[in-house]
Amino acid sequence: MKGSKNQLLIAIVLASAYLIHCKQFVTVFYGIPAWRNASIPLFCATKNRDTWGTIQCLPDNDDYQEITLNVTEAFDAWNNTVTEQAVEDVWNLFETSIKPCVKLTPLCVAMNCTRNMTTWTGRTDTQNITIINDTSHARADNCTGLKEEEMIDCQFSMTGLERDKRKQYTEAWYSKDVVCDNNTSSQSKCYMNHCNTSVITESCDKHYWDAMRFRYCAPPGFALLRCNDTNYSGFAPNCSKVVAATCTRMMETQTSTWFGFNGTRAENRTYIYWHGKDNRTIISLNNFYNLTMHCKRPGNKTVLPITFMSGFKFHSQPVINKKPRQAWCWFEGQWKEAMQEVKETLAKHPRYKGNRSRTENIKFKAPGRGSDPEVTYMWTNCRGESLYCNMTWFLNWVENRTGQKQRNYAPCRIRQIINTWHRVGKNLYLPPREGELTCNSTVTSIIANIDAGDQTNITFSAEAAELYRLELGDYKLVEITPIGFAPTSVKRYSSAHQRHTRGVFVLGFLGFLATAGSAMGAASLTLSAQSRTLLAGIVQQQQQLLDVVKRQQEMLRLTVWGTKNLQARVTAIEKYLKDQAQLNSWGCAFRQVCHTSVPWVNDTLTPDWNNMTWQEWEQKVRYLEANISQSLEQAQIQQEKNMYELQKLNSWDVFTNWLDFTSWVRYIQYGVYVVVGIVALRIVIYIVQMLSRLRKGYRPVFSSPPGYIQQIHIHKDQEQPAREETEEDVGSNGGDRSWPWPIAYIHFLIRLLIRLLTGLYNICRDLLSRISPILQPIFQSLQRALTAIRDWLRLKAAYLQYGCEWIQEAFQALARTTRETLAGAGRDLWRALQRIGRGILAVPRRIRQGAELALL
């Protein structure tokens, strides 16, 4: 029975120890390689030294880091803050450089206009099909088939700087750009179209639109992830070849429809970015085919300025020829082969639903008529002028359509009133500048909508913003989240921090993500180095950014880009201080591994330290962060309260604290309290005594009249000796006495104090005498329990000692037996080897003996 009780007790103790050991607590790790999607402003860097690049971008120094991550990450070219910022910023660049005329209506005056009824120059009604591949005539300004546009010559008078004088001006307009009172006759009164919605805010000087190359960079504390998978299509599948970078690649500022020009993503293959939910696509063309486009606006025209007031000008262009705004673009390269490869690539795409074996069912198609000009025609910008090109002949040429005109060039015209490509609205620009305009571009991509079915149509699109989905769609912006939670069996970190001599371990900021693909256990071993790398990388990037800002004094103008760059300087420090403030609120400031007393909330959710990365673990427990953070803050508040109470107790442990000046002030305060209490008690006692004497019929001592200063005569009994008079005899009917009341009163107070202290002593003695019998059984029971526990521990220690001795003897016996066995086996083996050796040595002797016997 006793043995079963011992076994039960041992089982309970072991179970308790197991439960205590298996209890999981929240552990805070600082410096883990994890991240989450972010949407903060990026800053740009460029090598262009034009006005916009100098003011609004930092100089590019080509000093950027990249590291490969062993992780799998999801990318989306459309739901992407990097591409959205690129679209917004390039739009601001376009508006800043081209400077549309807005505010203050420029030409809202009546104009006397003459309509020019024009026809096609060199147009023939023959049905013969002409295929033109030679562009020499286009370069020589003798293109046949280009029509003269319907123009309206207008004359109007306006006042300039001299307000009392009017001046006559001549301007040529497209018929669609003006509104006339009488549209049937050749002479009519006309007004500029959109007169009420277009106004001027600044000088409408002509500006060149020179494309610039720039890159985006992430602020310190953030990073850019890039997908290097060749099968990535802009939305899926998840990317397994991920690279972390501080900046993007260089990209070109593109503004066009239908085609993308001078892109940086062109490779020796054709690939397609396809939106995950609709038919929007961006097709990157193979640069092997050398696809180029050359545009030209010939002519030498005179441009006269109209000055409204100081600083405001509008340029007027007299009509000199019949095609003042005519231009054309011709295409060179292996276009037909490139378009055929596009069809073949589309047929192999996983999203394609048509017949994969028949590419002849895939056709290139122009958008329907009746849409905005930017949709109907290919719109591009050439040196600040907006060209609208009719691509019908070009599509006939690349598709080899029989029965229709096929030419490798397209007629274009320059417009002043254009639709904005990023926001809904219209902008008014100045008439074309004088002189010849030429621009050359490399065609690198196609913007299209794909309608798959029995007949698959690749319809060219006017979504100019799609160009940046291709340029930056393989990037994503992430925020480094170095703080992580995980359950461990350690409840509290109480050991002193040991400082070891370590070498400097700085990999730069991106080196912090170097262990992103490692298991949690392996990454946790380098948290100290990781946290130092994080801070060192932040400081390094801050210093680099500060240096380039100092070199760029134009940043003080605080333009849109300048504000972003200045904001990027403080983002990382704010992030680092925020992380440290959060760690401090949990009691984990400046610790890489911080054990807490907060229990882990979900026992079924535990990390796989050997196979799971920190990024995977953070994605699983991200929904618990708010609750864990609140619990850690509450635990830290309670810990601070406990530490405060403990420090109050510790102040009494050191004897020198008793002699401290502040302690003596406190002692004096306590003494004053005691004196005040005694005085108050004495007053109460005196009042009680006075009332008792009044009840006996005597007046109190202090009620004597002032005339009785020396003594009070009291009759007393003659037979009673004076030495036996006591306070109790006062009030007796016999005799009278003399009582010097001041001295007697002091004696009376002393007797009362002695009686009070004696009473308190008696009460305490009685209380202790009554408590002692009550506490004695409790102490005896506690002593018996401690004795039993001591005996039980001695018994278990004896059992453990006996077991250890038995195991030791068993090991000794095993070692002795093994030694003897090995020794015997060695001796037997040695004897066998000796016999074999003697036999081998005896072979010649046996042979000789055999030969002798044979000879005998």
UniProtKB/Swiss-Prot annotation:
Record site feature (Cleavage), residues: R502, G503
Task: List all annotated glycosylation positions.
Answer: 37, 70, 79, 112, 116, 128, 133, 142, 182-183, 196, 228, 231, 238, 262, 268, 279, 290, 300, 355, 390, 400, 440, 457, 602, 611, 627
What organism is recorded for this protein? Human immunodeficiency virus type 2 subtype A (isolate NIH-Z) (HIV-2)
What post-translational modification does the entry describe?
Specific enzymatic cleavages in vivo yield mature proteins. Envelope glycoproteins are synthesized as an inactive precursor that is heavily N-glycosylated and processed likely by host cell furin in the Golgi to yield the mature SU and TM proteins. The cleavage site between SU and TM requires the minimal sequence [KR]-X-[KR]-R.
Other remarks on this protein = Some HIV-2 isolates have been described that can infect cells independently of CD4, using CXCR4 as primary receptor. These isolates may have an exposed coreceptor binding site.
* Sequence motif Di-leucine internalization motif, residues: 855-856
Positions the record marks as coiled coil are: 615-636
Region spans: V3: 295-328
- This protein's gene is called env
Kindly name one Pfam family recorded for this protein: GP41
Give the Extracellular membrane side ranges.
Answer: 23-670
What are the UniProt keywords, alphabetically?
A: AIDS, Apoptosis, Clathrin-mediated endocytosis of virus by host, Cleavage on pair of basic residues, Coiled coil, Disulfide bond, Fusion of virus membrane with host endosomal membrane, Fusion of virus membrane with host membrane, Glycoprotein, Host cell membrane, Host endosome, Host membrane, Host-virus interaction, Inhibition of host innate immune response by virus, Inhibition of host tetherin by virus, Lipoprotein, Membrane, Palmitate, Signal, Transmembrane, Transmembrane helix, Viral attachment to host cell, Viral envelope protein, Viral immunoevasion, Viral penetration into host cytoplasm, Virion, Virus endocytosis by host, Virus entry into host cell
Explain the purpose of this protein: The surface protein gp120 (SU) attaches the virus to the host lymphoid cell by binding to the primary receptor CD4. This interaction induces a structural rearrangement creating a high affinity binding site for a chemokine coreceptor like CXCR4 and/or CCR5. This peculiar 2 stage receptor-interaction strategy allows gp120 to maintain the highly conserved coreceptor-binding site in a cryptic conformation, protected from neutralizing antibodies. Since CD4 also displays a binding site for the disulfide-isomerase P4HB/PDI, a P4HB/PDI-CD4-CXCR4-gp120 complex may form. The surface protein gp120 is a ligand for CD209/DC-SIGN and CLEC4M/DC-SIGNR, which are respectively found on dendritic cells (DCs), and on endothelial cells of liver sinusoids and lymph node sinuses. These interactions allow capture of viral particles at mucosal surfaces by these cells and subsequent transmission to permissive cells. DCs are professional antigen presenting cells, critical for host immunity by inducing specific immune responses against a broad variety of pathogens.
The region called V5 is annotated at 455-460
TM ranges are: 671-691
Please give the sites of covalent lipid attachment annotated as S-palmitoyl cysteine: C764
List GO terms (cellular component aspect).
Answer: host cell endosome membrane; host cell plasma membrane; membrane; viral envelope; virion membrane
Q: What is this protein called?
A: Envelope glycoprotein gp160
Which residues are the signal sequence here?
1-22
What GO annotations for molecular function exist for this entry? structural molecule activity
Q: Which CDD domains match?
A: HIV-1-like_HR1-HR2
Q: Specify whether DNA damage is a keyword of the entry.
A: no
Annotated region MPER: where? 648-669
